[in-house]
Amino acid sequence: MKCPFCAHPDSKVVDSRPDKGGAAIRRRRECESCAKRFTTHERIEETLPLVLKKDGRREPFDRMKIVGGILKACEKRQVSRETVDRLVDRLEGRLQEWSEKEVPSTTIGEWVMTELHDIDEVAYVRFASVYRSFKDVNEFMAELQDLLKK
């Protein structure tokens, strides 16, 4: 595995153990060139349904794209990276159980919003503001009113 510090192509595994959920392997590696250590996570590559975008394009599910969007919504909030990872793990679990070959991106977005609503309401509103593409302040205020009613 290529070293993230010096880009040397070889490293050795110094420790290997299952992660907390058992769905992945956490490995500590040491670069054979600069001797710096880094962590990698190995997980089974699942066959997930393709994501059907609003414009009709189809693309593979990208875990890091979802993580990035959620992290952006949770910026400067008391939401840990571990919480975000668990949220995305649950999302991937739902995708694995999805019975069709394609899943609309709108469905994934709604799942994320449902999860975020339970975790952090500010992160929920931030994610919704990007995901729902409010056309004006009135639409945004209507979403806030719905949130306050719940």
From Swiss-Prot:
Protein's UniProt name: Transcriptional repressor NrdR
Cofactor list: Zn(2+)
Residues covered by the ATP-cone domain: 49-139
Zinc finger (unnamed): 3-34
Biological function: Negatively regulates transcription of bacterial ribonucleotide reductase nrd genes and operons by binding to NrdR-boxes.
Note on how the cofactor is bound: Binds 1 zinc ion.
A GO MF term: ATP binding
Keywords for this protein: ATP-binding, DNA-binding, Metal-binding, Nucleotide-binding, Repressor, Transcription, Transcription regulation, Zinc, Zinc-finger
Pfam family for this entry, one: Zn_ribbon_NrdR
Species this chain originates from: Geobacter metallireducens (strain ATCC 53774 / DSM 7210 / GS-15)
Name of the gene: nrdR
Residues in coiled coil: none
InterPro entries (alphabetical): ATP-cone_dom, NrdR-like_N, RNR_NrdR-like
GO biological process: negative regulation of DNA-templated transcription
Family: Belongs to the NrdR family.
Annotated PANTHER family: TRANSCRIPTIONAL REPRESSOR NRDR
